[in-house]
Amino acid sequence: MFTINAEVRKEQGKGASRRLRAANKFPAIIYGGKEAPLAIELDHDKVINMQAKAEFYSEVLTIVVDGKEIKVKAQDVQRHPYKPKLQHIDFVRA
């Protein structure tokens, strides 16, 4: 099972997302269930190694946000067109 540490995003929008990517992080969102969608930021280097394994897409993942564990599945992964970089991930609550 994969466990990912995340932080709640303070800023949203194109400029904020670009600043995150320049800082070796990237935006993501957790949605689904009865709770409101949660915009988060993830560390790129940690997640890029995890997503190289097929289990990342098929198993339930645990994301820790502010000490609270959220069970999710990866729904959509957006990659850079030619660089080996992740741009954004959508997670759906499990």
Curated annotation (Swiss-Prot):
InterPro entries: Rbsml_bL25/Gln-tRNA_synth_N, Ribosomal_bL25/Gln-tRNA_synth, Ribosomal_bL25_short, Ribosomal_L25_dom, Ribosomal_uL5_bac-type. It comes from the Bacteria. One of its GO terms (cellular component) is cytosolic large ribosomal subunit. One of its GO terms (biological process) is translation. Keywords: Ribonucleoprotein, Ribosomal protein, RNA-binding, rRNA-binding. CDD domains: Ribosomal_L25_TL5_CTC. Signal peptide: none annotated. Part of the 50S ribosomal subunit; part of the 5S rRNA/L5/L18/L25 subcomplex. Contacts the 5S rRNA. Binds to the 5S rRNA independently of L5 and L18. This is one of the proteins that binds to the 5S RNA in the ribosome where it forms part of the central protuberance. Belongs to the bacterial ribosomal protein bL25 family. NCBIfam families: PRK05943.1 (NF004612). This is Large ribosomal subunit protein bL25. It comes from Shigella boydii serotype 18 (strain CDC 3083-94 / BS512). The gene is rplY.
